[in-house]
From Swiss-Prot:
Gene3D superfamilies in the cross-refs: membrane protein fhac, membrane protein fhac: a member of the omp85/tpsb transporter family
Topology of the protein relative to the lipid bilayer: Multi-pass membrane protein
Modified residues (N6-methyllysine): 255
Annotated protein name in UniProt: Sorting and assembly machinery component 50 homolog
Keywords: Cytoplasm, Membrane, Methylation, Mitochondrion, Mitochondrion outer membrane, Transmembrane, Transmembrane beta strand
One of the Pfam families matching this protein, by short name: Omp85
Domain comment quoted from the record: Its C-terminal part seems to contain many membrane-spanning sided beta-sheets, that have the potential to adopt a transmembrane beta-barrel type structure.
Role noted for this protein: Plays a crucial role in the maintenance of the structure of mitochondrial cristae and the proper assembly of the mitochondrial respiratory chain complexes. Required for the assembly of TOMM40 into the TOM complex.
Gene designation: SAMM50
Family the UniProt entry places it in: Belongs to the SAM50/omp85 family.
BP GO terms, sorted: cristae formation; mitochondrial respiratory chain complex assembly; protein insertion into mitochondrial outer membrane
Transmembrane segments: none
Subunit: Associates with the mitochondrial contact site and cristae organizing system (MICOS) complex, composed of at least MICOS10/MIC10, CHCHD3/MIC19, CHCHD6/MIC25, APOOL/MIC27, IMMT/MIC60, APOO/MIC23/MIC26 and QIL1/MIC13. This complex was also known under the names MINOS or MitOS complex. The MICOS complex associates with mitochondrial outer membrane proteins SAMM50, MTX1 and MTX2 (together described as components of the mitochondrial outer membrane sorting assembly machinery (SAM) complex) and DNAJC11, mitochondrial inner membrane protein TMEM11 and with HSPA9.
Domain POTRA positions: 45-125
Organism encoding this protein: Bos taurus (Bovine)
Taxonomic lineage: Eukaryota, Metazoa, Chordata, Craniata, Vertebrata
Amino acid sequence: MGTVHARSLEPLPASGPDFGALGEEAEFVEVEPEAKQEILENKDVVVQHVHFDGLGRTKDDIIMYEIRDVFKAKNLIEVMRKSHEAREKLLRLGIFRQVDVLIDTCQGDDALPNGLDVTFEVTELRRLTGSYNTMVGNNEGSMVLGLKLPNLLGRAEKVTFQFSYGTKETSYGLSFFKPQPGNFDRNFSVNLYKVTGQFPWSSLRETDRGVSAEYSFPTWKTSHTVKWEGVWRELGCLSRVASFAVRKESGHSLKSSLSHSMVIDSRNSSILPKRGALLKVNQELAGYTGGDVSFLKEDFELQLNKQLILDTVFSASLWGGMLVPMGDKPSSIADRFYLGGPTSVRGFSMHSVGPQSEGDYLGGEAYWAGGLHLYTPLPFRPGQGGFGELFRTHFFLNAGNLCNLNYGEGPKAHIRKLAECIRWSYGAGIVLRLGNIARLELNYCVPMGVQRGDRICDGVQFGAGIRFL
């Protein structure tokens, strides 16, 4: 994606300062010596000018926020470090295809003996980019068309449109994203969408047409998202043999909800971490801003990771949640929690744990799930240092429960009910990390604590996703 160049400067000593981990895109500093060089690496320097080559529709003010720290550098090492950091910030905006940095001695009548000029050579993304692909899954084929307008108004705004035309369903989504200048983590987005989901474990089809607006911002070591969503939901039966409980849920509803999520994440990787912790807490309040659906929903996710000897990693995770209906109406099948499957309590079929009617799983208003995991390198370390590092041997123990609570009873009764009829499983398998995108698991599972009505997957189970218990 580019290189930091230093011109008319002596090469850095081999024992020079450590730049730290500069990211996957960082490259070695390229030094181009010239005649009559002046040794500046150990002297104070002043960044007199910062130039940009290649700017078109990008506004100057948003650029100045990203490169202002370059002027604060006091020596050559700081200039090079802060120039690299500014380059990373510019790339993060998502408006440049390439960013190169050139550091040169200052020229001109106002040039100081220790003055430097920093030049950013940038290549902007095109005004319109597109993608086209096909997807096959769940006995359905679909064509997906995507369009993106990056840097729409010159300040890193982005408009994205995605249209999916399938043999069974058609979906679309339109979104507008705008970051705050100088603070990319503080951003605002608006989404308009229509999406259809099929849930065979419940014999249910759900079509959502909605609009949402959300604001994300960091505070100290946490990140927060505040969101409003208004959605028109249409529920229908997926098959003619759907249970009466599912048929009773069919029809239209309007949900207007306010939600807040807080995340504290110190993990070194979100897909297969070796160290660090994650805490995620979500709250959703529906009905206060309108609609005919009213509830209060709380859930959390906790994960701890510790690297042991011989590149072995121990991981512990805990999920939990509760849904409290408000008013006279019971909770909807579309809002309840579901449990079971290769990404939660392994050894059970997808979302096939807990309350059910005639083979259709109805979800629950309260749940918990926990897991203990041990990840080790492959035996004999094949492909060590290369492709083999993407694989891990996996040993696990999972447990959890899903049920409905009587909110007229006290907390002790709720805890007692959640502690009854615990489903649990253990097993071993292989994990494949697909970069920082997703991970695949192939496990041999032994389900235990099976209750009447649960659907199990005894033996080999395959899972793919980004969020695992």
